[in-house]
UniProtKB/Swiss-Prot annotation:
Keyword annotations: Hydrolase, Magnesium, Metal-binding, Nuclease, Toxin-antitoxin system
Disulfide bonds: none
Family the UniProt entry places it in: Belongs to the PINc/VapC protein family.
Alphabetized Pfam families for the sequence: PIN
Lineage: Bacteria, Bacillati, Actinomycetota, Actinomycetes, Mycobacteriales
Name the UniProt record assigns to this protein: Ribonuclease VapC26
Length: 135
């Protein structure tokens, strides 16, 4: 399962309205919990600016703890993501969402845990079809 920034923000912040639904998806998943470096960067910024450095450090330590599949994105993945950004440029999706599409292909999954239904209802898997967007 590919996990987007919005879902991780809800997971790590119990005050978020979707915290329980996202937590259930993560805590009950038998799939790898795949997180891109771009999602980590977005999450780090949001937590640091909204909540503070202590929360930021707690999130980073949790992500580094081994339960999460921290995916690598090299030049080939960035090039592939750039093609996706080009294809969907009217949607203004950005590198984080495009990398999630690339990683979904690499990990052979169509399941995306996100609260960003607008983008992921428009985006398509590289191999065709549709993503399964949860929660």
């Amino acid at each position: 399962m590919i996990i987007d920034t919005s879902a991780l923000l809800a997971y790590f912040d119990a005050a978020e309205p979707d915290h329980a639904a996202v937590s259930e998806c993560i805590d009950s998943s038998a799939d790898a919990l795949v997180v891109s470096p771009y999602v980590v960067a977005e999450l780090d910024y949001l937590v640091a600016t909204r909540v503070g450095v202590d929360a930021e450090l707690a999130v980073l330590r949790e992500l580094a703890g081994g339960a999460w599949e921290l995916a690598n994105c090299g030049a080939a993945e960035i090039e592939q993501a750039a093609r996706i950004v080009t294809k969907y440029q009217d949607q203004r999706i950005g590198i984080a969402d495009a990398a999630n599409v690339v990683l979904a292909d690499r990990y052979r999954t169509r399941t995306i845990l996100t609260l960003d239904r607008r983008h992921f209802s428009a985006l398509r898997p590289i191999g065709g079809g549709r993503f399964t967007v949860i929660p």
